[in-house]
Structures are given as C-alpha cells and as structure tokens.
Amino acid sequence: MTPRRTVLLALRLALCAPLPARAQEPRRPREVPGRDFRPEGVWRRQARAVRATRARLLAQRQFAALNAPLATGVPIPSAAAVSGTLRVPAVLFTYAGTPAPTFASTAYDAVLFGATPPFGRPYTYHSFYSQLSNGLLDVQGATYGWVRLSQPEASYNGGTSSACQQENPFGSTNCNGIWSGAAFGALQAGLRQALALVDAQVDFSQFSYDPGSGVVSLVLFMQPALGGECGPSSGPENHLWAHRGALFPGYMTQDPWPGHAGKFLQVQDYVLQSGLGGSNSCTGTDIMPIGTVAHETGHGFGLPDLYDTSDSTAGVGRWSLMGAGNFSSPSSPSRMDAWSLSQLGWVTLVPLATSGTYSFGAAPTSDTAFLVRPTGANPRGEYFLLENRQAVDADSALIRNACQVWYQAATPPGCSGGLLAWHVDSQQVAQHGFESGNAVNAGPIHGLELLQADARGNLDANPNIPCTPPAAGCGDRGDVGDPYPGVTQNPTLALFTTPNTALNSGACPGVGIDSITQVVPNGALRFVLRLGGDSLAVATAPRLVAAQWGYSYSLTLAAACGTGSYSWAGPDSGAAPPGLTVSPTGVLSGAPTDTGTFTFRVSVTDGTQTARRTLTLHVVEPTLTMQQVLDLGFLGPAPAGDDRRRYLDLQGNANGTFDIGDVARWLARTGNGAAPGATARTAGRRP
C-alpha cells in the first residue's frame, strides 16, 4: 500500500472520531432572521413619532420636556413617551389527533394578563411592562381557545427537506414551519384557520388597532408543543419555531372597521410561540415563560435587536431585554437597557455637563440614567449612558444568573450588580438600526457597546472561536465582571484604562470616571466624573481580538486626542506573534506562525507627542473538522483558500508547502487517527 493510500485510509477511519471540545458558554439559536412585523405594525408608527420628538428635544437640550412623562412620579401621557393601553388577543390552537393540551386557557390568561403572577412567578406579561414603563404602558388582553385545526401537525410545519436543512440553525432537515417558503405558507394557513375558528367568539374592535389602516395591533398565537427553537435533542422534534411575523394577505375578521362602512378589521402582525417552556423556555411539563413575547413586543415599538445579528459577538448579551435578556430568566426577563428605555421615554435622562461627584439609586427604583457627552469634536454623535443595575425587581434574576459565571463552579464572593457604562454611537444606530437592516451591534463598530469592567471583553469575543476560560477572548452573554466596580473592584474608566472611553471617530473624548463606589448593597452608587484634560493616547484596548495559528490577521490600531497625523512603531518591548508586524500606518497584520499569548508595546507619535501602550494578543489553534481536512488533501479545492493549508503546514513539517506529511501530523496531534511514519515537531508549538 502506498503512503498516500495509508494516510487516506487513516483519514477515512478517523471520520467517526470526536472533534475537539470548545470551551464556550452554550448557545442556542433563537430568533428567525428575515421574519418581522410590518414597518407600520404593532405600535411602530407611534413609537417612531416618539423617537423623533425625543431626538429633537435631546438636540435642543430641553431635558424638562424630555423627562416630563416621569417628572411628577405619576405617569403622564406625552408626545415624548410611548404610552397608553395595548390590548392584545391570544389565540391557542392545537392539531387534529393531538392529545388535549396540558394547561387550560385560564392559565394563559393568568400568565399573560393577570395582575398577580401565578405559579410562583414574579411577573406576568402585563405586570412586567407596567413596571418597565413606570406605568406608562398597560398591556391588557384575553385568551381564546384551545381550538383544534383540521389537520395533524405535519400539515402545518412543512415537513422535512434539504432546503430547510440549509437554513435550520441546528442543521436539521426539520422545516419547523419557517425554514422554507413552502413551510412558512403552511404555517400561515394554520394561523388563518385558527383565527377563523375563534372569530365568532372575538370582537376584534375591543382590542388595539390602527384606526387609519384597520389592522389589529398585535395577536399572540400559542401552539401546544415545545418550540422548534429548543432543537432536535433526542429525536425529530419538528414543531413550530417561535417568531414574530405578519400574515400576507391579512386575515379579514367578521368585525366592522369603526368609521369605515362596509369594511372590516384585519389581522396581520403576530407573535407565535410555544404554550410550554418553563424557566428555561424548553421544559415540556411547564407553562410558557414571558421572555419571548416581552422581547418581540419591544420590536413592536421599533427597538432593534441588541445582540449581534451576525453572530460574531454577543452584543449586549443578557444585560438587556433586547439582547439575550429575555432568556436570562424567561419568567423574569432582564429589564431593557438605558438606551432602549430612553428611546421609549421610560427613563429619566439626566445630563452631566460638569466635573464632580454624583450618585444614584438602582435603576428600577431611581428611574434615572446619566448622559455624558464628549467634550470635543463629535462627528458620529457618540455619548455615554450610565445606569445602576442591582439585584432589584426584574434585575434580581439577571444579577443572580450573571453571578453564576459559566466557567466557575461556584458564585464569586461579593457578587452583586453595579454601574453599567454604555457607549452609544448615534451614526451606527442611524445607519444600521431596526429600519436599516437591524444590525446595530454587527460589525466592527457597535451602536450600543457595554464597557466591561473586568477588561476580558467576553461580550465582544467571537463565540465561534475556541478558547480557554476565563481568559479574554472567551465569549459569553455577560457576567458580573461587567459592572463597575464589580467582582474585579475596578473603580476607574478613562481613556488610559482597559476598557476605555475612546471614541469610534478617533476624536478626543475628554471623559473620565473614577472612585466608583457601591455605597449601599443592591442600592446607591457614587462616582467622580472628570471632563476634559485628555492627551494623546493609544485608544486600542490592550487585549486584542484573538488570532488563529496560520490564518491571515489584520487589525488597525487606534489613537485619540491628537491631530490625526499619526506614525506608529513597535514593538519596542516584548514581542509580537511571529509572522505579524506593525506598519507605520498602525496596521498589525500577517499570519501568526505559532500559538501562545504574546505581550508587546507599540508607540504612536503625533508631532511632539508620543504615547505608548502594551498590548496582548492570544493566538489560538483553529478547529478543523475531518471533512475540511479531507477536502483540502484529497477531495478537491479548499473552500477556504490558503489559511487552512498554511496552518496545517505550520503544525506539520513547516516546509512551506502543504503535503501529506502535514495531514499525517494533524491526525497524530489531534487524536483523529494514527499516522504511520509521522514525525512530531512540537518544539515551540502548542501540543
């Protein structure tokens, strides 16, 4: 047998070998891209007018008018806040041949619209939004059903197909009523049938609707099985996947459209979710949580997703209902972040324009967020929002879960909330907001970025890259290292700290915060604000985005508080990863030829000023599947170009050419198969 055939046989035998484990916080795909309410759906028209009013008042610095809805302690309807009563019908449906659902419709009335939460829960859909809005929004409704559709479940979920497998985040062939056009059509046919079955019982004119279009604001649908988003865990669970959407064409009800003779109200915008789920959203014996419908209702007010819709980071993670906070504790979702609340007029926004000492209470009780603007040029409209998040009200579950750090067996000592410092980039929000692609926190600049006190940047790390926790570069959805001073007791945020107050525009922020102190446990915070006085600095965070062994890498270093005529040099101490260099224009690029953690210092000069900063770059080993290696070595051209070949050569015989010896070495090193005659070359390389 030839050496080539020997290695080929070893490769094929190794196909069944396990892949290397990845140390990352477990993730589950949830939201369905491309499915949405109409542009004018739910209360988006009203919310758009509120945002325009608030933007004008903010630009004019008319804070008394901006904060008028909450100024007296009693909610006051105003053009500067989303307010009123949102009346929502909920329709429960099941399928032909399906056993009777576990919970009666009265249980759903209690979970969604009750004043007193049932089942020992802290909130209903109604009470959660009442507290979140400080009484400005009253969610009311009624539940109808269960009604039984005429066909089995398989008639409405779209069955299975290879087309659905290409779209399904689990890689399953399940269509879940959503992963192909045909499946979505089948699902919507089921929703229309459910509406027809309850139409005689429901007077849709008693629920919220747009008087200008005759469209009911929102309808909730509940189906009897666990949601498809819970995954095909032990078998083919081809159930409908929770999502928001709109019926096209809309369903014409039997109820007249008031003021429009001969015309009738329509149903278009809806939220579909499972009627089951419990505290983790996927427990089949417990009634549904409220996290999904609470999150989707936020979209009904025009708020964007604040997780990273490109799946390259966690975005804001669990720290906001519009991030992953709806799943932090689905029975008690996280509050909205200060920026989202300010968009709706549900928080008092206090500007800080002078240096000094300030204090404020926990967010749910103080209803206050501080606004801090840069002191100099600000072409992107950047600013900072400060809020005090403690284990109070809805944030109790948030802080408890954040304290259960995913990479530790026990809760850290002194675990509590603290000050959250948000960096807002208005240009990013305007160009990539909910009505412009819903990509606020996708890409190199995030519209709303949480400056994480522990300097690990877990929210900003790519969750798809392997790492060893709790190091920087390990992705999670937020932990108690993020607030100030937090478990790391970090009292300072400034241009020279990690993280820092650097602006995305490169302009000088002139903002520093120090002496951040928790005055009362789960209560008041105090800090000192210092405005102005910044000099030339390297603005790039010291812990760089992780690189991969042999893969192309490029990162542009940033400076601030200079004229912009920057000249870069380095390293002048330590050593960058071999294969990477710093250009005079500040680009760190190349392809690392080794793994490890590398610490080195760079400098930037602007006229007579020079600033230096020590940087750390972690180079990790890529994770390749056996099929990817087969594709590279034997089954045709490599889909990913030269990066994978370069990596395999470096970990192999490092002779500058990708060959069978490299594949043999990879097999031996990773345990995916024995490679006869392979010679290990491990000196200076990750074992």
Regions found by a protein language model. Give the residues of each.
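Active-site-proximal segments of metallohydrolase catalytic domains
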Residues: 69-80, 127-263
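Extracellular hydrolytic enzyme modules, especially secreted metalloproteases
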Residues: 129, 217-408, 427
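Extracellular low-complexity, Gly/Ser/Thr-rich intrinsically disordered linkers
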Residues: 362-533
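Proline-enriched interdomain boundary motifs that mark the N-terminal boundary
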Residues: 534-542
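Short glycine/proline-centered coil/turn motifs in the loop regions
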Residues: 560-564, 574, 607
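Strand-loop-strand motifs at the edges of beta-sheets in extracellular beta-sandwich domains
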Residues: 576-593, 647-648
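Cellulosome-associated attachment modules in secreted, modular CAZymes
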Residues: 616-687
